[in-house]
Amino acid sequence: MGSIKVAERRNVVWITINAPERRNAYDLEMARAIIAAIEDAAEAHAVVITGAGGSFCAGGALTELGDPDPEQLRRLFTTSARLLDTIRACPRPVIAAVDGPAAGGGNELVVACDFAIATERSTF
C-alpha cells in the first residue's frame, strides 16, 4: 500500500506520491490525502506534486480493486474527479514536478496543475 508524504519548505507544500512499487498509482485513501493536503495548504505560496522512486504517477490503482463492483469503480472515479477539481480550484499555483512516467490518470494530474516541470526521463 502506498502513502502520501507532505512537507512544507519555505512556504511551499510538497506532496509526494509514495507508491513506487506500483509506479505511484494512487488508491482512494491516497487521493483523499492529496485532496486534504491541498485544502490544508492555505498559508502556502505554492503546492508541488511529485512522485517517489523515478515515476510521477500511473493514475488510479485499478489493480488494488481486485474484482471491482460498479460501486467501487464509481468511488474511485468520483474521488479522482474531485482530486482534479481540487487541483484546478486551488488559489495557489500547483506545480507538477515530473520525473519519469506520467501515465493514465497521472497525465490528468499534470494537466490539472498550473505548471509542469519535467526531467529528460519524463514521458507522457
Please give the residue ranges for each predicted region.
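Hydrophobic alpha-helical membrane-association signature
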Residues: M30-I34, L76-T79, L109
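Glycine-rich beta-to-alpha active-site loop
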Residues: D85-F124
